[in-house]
Design a protein with these regions (language model features):
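A short glycine-rich, Lys/Arg-flanked "PGG" loop and its adjoining helix->strand segment in the class I
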Residues: 161-174
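Class I SAM-dependent methyltransferase Rossmann-like catalytic core
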Residues: 32, 39-70
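Conserved SAM-binding loop of SAM-dependent methyltransferases across substrates and taxa
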Residues: 83-95
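Conserved beta-strand signature within the Rossmann-like core of class I S-adenosyl-L-methionine
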Residues: 174-183
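Class I S-adenosyl-L-methionine
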Residues: 189-220
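A short SAM/SAH-binding and catalytic strip from SAM-dependent methyltransferases
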Residues: 142-159
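Conserved class I S-adenosyl-L-methionine
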Residues: 72-82
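S-adenosyl-L-methionine
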Residues: 109-140
């Protein structure tokens, strides 16, 4: 009898653990679906601001984060973080929240980011104005990398070039980079060997729309 009771107790504990795991997975999936829905609603209202129809997929976010050196001194700045998919990948890469500076134009997304990443610094502002915005915010703190989820192809070519030039002028260190993704087969800003180098990663197929990551660094 005692053995049967003990077996029943173990079974109940095992079932309780399994249920907890299933509930956790369901909550996570629901949260991701809710993010997709919220992002899609914002895109429907302001398509030129968001550019993408849905948040970046995890494989693309990991590819973006892989271009960042988490040991580099200074801030990692993210432009247009949206719901924080790339932000989370950067943290998983090893970037401390305290070293993250997130610039988000949409105030609802900015509030969401503050709740999700309470130790990161979140600024509601225009990421295309980093030449004026970043020095005022970062001060003397060096910038290790700038990661961009901005929809560059929705902007004129000169504005795209200016953003890359402004970003690279703010980044310090030999390994510092401006990192951008796009769905197009060509880079959003072409190579300029006199000003910066350009490297494209392999195409990330496991995304809603296949994308590639482009890494810009100042020419030596």
């Amino acid at each position: 009898m005692r053995q049967a009771v003990e077996q029943a107790r173990k079974l109940e504990h095992a079932l309780a653990r399994q249920r907890a795991v299933l509930e956790w997975r369901a909550r996570r999936q629901f949260s991701e679906l809710r993010d997709d829905l919220r992002f899609s609603l914002e895109w429907a209202a302001k398509p030129m601001e968001l550019g993408a129809v849905s948040p970046s997929g995890k494989p693309l976010a990991r590819m973006m984060a892989a271009q960042v050196d988490p040991q580099a001194a200074g801030l990692v700045v993210e432009l247009g973080p949206g719901t924080g998919v790339i932000t989370k990948a950067l943290i998983e890469r090893g970037v401390a929240q305290e070293h993250l500076l997130l610039i988000e134009y949409n105030p609802d997304f900015a509030d969401m980011l503050r709740r999700r990443f309470p130790r990161a610094r979140v600024i509601t502002g225009d990421a295309y104005n980093i030449a004026n915005l970043l020095p005022a915010i970062a001060g003397d703190t060096p910038i290790a990398a700038i990661v961009s989820g901005l929809p560059l192809f929705t902007r004129p070519a000169e504005q795209r070039r200016k953003l890359v030039r402004d970003a690279l002028a703010l980044i310090g260190g030999a390994t510092g980079a401006f990192i951008q993704f796009s769905y197009a087969l060509v880079p959003p800003v072409p190579r300029d060997p006199w000003a910066y180098t350009l490297r494209g990663t392999k195409r990330v197929w496991w995304n809603l729309f296949p994308a590639r990551v482009w890494v810009y660094r100042r020419s030596q």
